[in-house]
Amino acid sequence: EQALQLKEVGVTRYHSNIETAPSHFPDICTTHSYEDKMFTIDNAKKAGIRVCSGGILGLNETLEQRVEMAFELKRLNIDSIPLNILNPIKGTPFEDNKALKPMEILRTFAVFRFILPKALIRTAGGREVNLRDLQSYALKGGLNGIMVGGYLTTGGRSPQDDLRMIDDLELTRTAVQL
């Protein structure tokens, strides 16, 4: 019912990250179940609202669980996928997580692209800290885009630096309304 109300007032896309692989979800989220998440996504889609959904890399998931998450997004027919990378912050439940290495992240992006060849896949939170000088490789190795500016809990690079990177790669700048 709520999804239909959102559709009636003009909502065209709803964001609801699956966060991680279904098999890893109970270890990550304690406020709701994976079934609750699926209920929300299914209702939005049934109401005719497109769904944007992705997750966070670096939550102590296995490589197999990363692949599982990609196939889950494919099963759900998600065409807009943000991939965040955990930036361990002191005072949070994941403060002691070991940061992922840049090449591991880039390989993960390539696997997602292989599994989801037509999806809009982009990276957002944690990319500056985790990819460091290799951020541009993500755009040449599988991602369609990056989120620019600050994120929910941390700041990002300046938009000017990101635009310069895009220009240096000789890519076309396209603002996407999600």
Which residues does each PLM region occupy?
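Conserved non-cysteine loop/helix-boundary elements of the Radical SAM core domain that shape
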Residues: E1-G48, I56-N77, T92-E104
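Short glycine/serine/threonine-biased micro-segments
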Residues: E8, C52, I56, A124, ...
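Short beta-strand segments at enzyme active-site cores
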Residues: Y14-S16, R50-G55, I81-I85, R122
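Hydrophobic alpha-helical segments
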Residues: Y34, I41, R50-V51, F109, ...
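A structural motif corresponding to the C-terminal end of an alpha-helix
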Residues: T40-V51, V111-I121
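Auxiliary Fe-S-binding modules of radical SAM enzymes
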Residues: F71-L178
